[in-house]
Amino acid sequence: MDYVDELTSGRTPLVKKAAKKILKGKLKGYGPFLHQALEGEMEKPKSWESQMYLLYAIAATDCTEEVPYLKSLLLRDIPTPVTYRSLAVAIAYLENSETENLSFVYESLESNNFSQVAGACAAIYMKKIVLKDDDFNKIMSYVTQPKYLEHIGQVINPFLFILAASYLYPEQNRQKIVDFSRQFNEVHINTIIDDVSKGKDGRRVRLF
């Protein structure tokens, strides 16, 4: 347990460094210490980066017991959008550790919180969930709404994660989102389209 002292130090630079190493190595057994560190960092509004790495580490090391706590954090008034996205990706990632469970994804889609929706969609991509036709169509009906398409090319919009995951999808569904995406004629989007059209994961929008 090489990183306990850093995680429990209360010092943001040390906490962030430890979380990044745990994330990189997917080191198991740090769950309680990651929880403790996250509790401390959530009290620091400007510590979004350490919060992000702690949440990614919790997800990547399968700390499923943390889901109720993470959901409670979503109820807070959090000043940084990145933290909402990080919370959402961690929750959806953990809830799909063993079996497919899209309930939180749909809760997020109903939330009208851009960052939360992006995080939930990121988990679909990162867990390589092959959406059933009904789920694909429902999720597409949300992520293609104008409010989720703002600032194309400047932010990672929710639909980009569904596009990136579409290399796994049946041809009909993949073509549907590719056709939708072509309208933007944006370099990053066009690169993802090229990847999925070849049936491969270009790993261009992975969060961790």
Q: Which residues are covered by each model-predicted region?
A:
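Short inter-helical turns and helix N-cap capping residues of alpha-solenoid HEAT/ARM repeat scaffolds
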Residues: 10-12, 42-47, 78-82, 112-114, ...
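Amphipathic alpha-helical scaffolding segments comprising HEAT/armadillo-like alpha-solenoid repeats
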Residues: 1-6, 25-41, 63-75, 97-110, ...
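Residue-level signal for functionally critical sites in structured catalytic/ligand-binding pockets
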Residues: 81-84, 105-108, 115-118, 139
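Terminal, low-structured helical/coil segments at or just beyond the last alpha-helical repeat
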Residues: 179-208
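General structural signal for secondary-structure boundaries
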Residues: 14, 31, 133, 182, ...
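Structural detector for internal amphipathic alpha-helices that build alpha-solenoid repeat scaffolds
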Residues: 13-28, 48-64, 82-97, 117-130, ...
